[in-house]
Amino acid sequence: MDAIKKKMVAMKMEKENALDRAEQLEQKLRETEEAKAKIEDDYNSLQKKSIQTENDLDNTQTQLQDVQAKYETTEKQIAEHEQEIQSLTRKISMLEEDIMKSEERYTTAASKLEEASKAADESERNRKVLENLNCGNDERIDQLEKQLTEAKWIAEEADKKYEEAARKLAITEVDLERAEARLEAAEAKVIDLEEQLTVVGANIKTLQVQNDQASQREDSYEETIRDLTNRLKDAENRATEAERTVSKLQKEVDRLEDELLTEKEKYKAISDELDATFAELAGY
């Protein structure tokens, strides 16, 4: 009888110990599941941060490309303005050369006109001399008539040259007026281009400032990209570590569940044995 009582006490203590171990295992299982849930939340948060980091990186790269495209467009516009200024400068030089040539032609025509006037005056003087010397011999008269005829021819040629010179002078004056008009238009265009160049210069300075700011932003973007890349790598590493931890915890949960099941089976066996013992005692 004492042996049975001792056995019952031992079985009762074993039952209590089994209950304690079961409660401890259940508590450990709950803690493990909570840790697993926390790690899964951290993992999901890291995934969201990783996606946000990639989006930030894409946006930064897009902004950098936009700044570079605007800078290249501005450089092309500046080059086009410089080419236009060079072309107008060449046209102005050509107009100045045309004006100089027109002035030279005008000077030449004036000289020829003066020569023609002198020849006409000389012919008139010869004619008057011939009239005063009308009493000379026939040979002298013939000679003088020839000289007069020659003088008239020279005068006619001088008149023709004068008319030609006057015509050329009129053409030259028209050309000069046109050249002056073109020169005025060119000067106005140059003034306009100088104003545009001033504006372009101001724009260039602004663009240089913007370019410097863009370079600073680019450096900042690059630093941000490096930081985001490092954070992304760190997040990926943490995510990988979290996956490993979740896997370990899942294995631990499975082990604890198996151990809890084993303890429950032991508890059931002890309970069945106690029930059988009580039934046996009741039979006495």
Curated annotation (Swiss-Prot):
Which proteins does it associate with, and in what oligomeric form?
Homodimer.
**Annotated TM spans:** none
Its ancestry begins with: Eukaryota, Metazoa, Spiralia, Lophotrochozoa, Mollusca
Q: What does this protein do?
A: Tropomyosin, in association with the troponin complex, plays a central role in the calcium dependent regulation of muscle contraction.
Coiled-coil residues are 1-284
Where does the record place the region Disordered? 32-60
Its family remark reads:
Belongs to the tropomyosin family.
Question: Can you name this protein?
Answer: Tropomyosin
Domain note: The molecule is in a coiled coil structure that is formed by 2 polypeptide chains. The sequence exhibits a prominent seven-residues periodicity.
The record's listing under InterPro entries reads:
Tropomyosin (IPR000533)
This chain's source organism reads Mytilus galloprovincialis
Note one Pfam family from the annotation. Answer: Tropomyosin
Does the keyword Signal feature in the UniProt annotation?
no
Compositional bias (Basic and acidic residues):
32-41
Query: Which keywords annotate this record?
Result: Coiled coil, Repeat
Cite the record's Polar residues compositional bias ranges: 44-60
By its UniProt entry, which SUPFAM superfamilies does this protein fall under? Tropomyosin
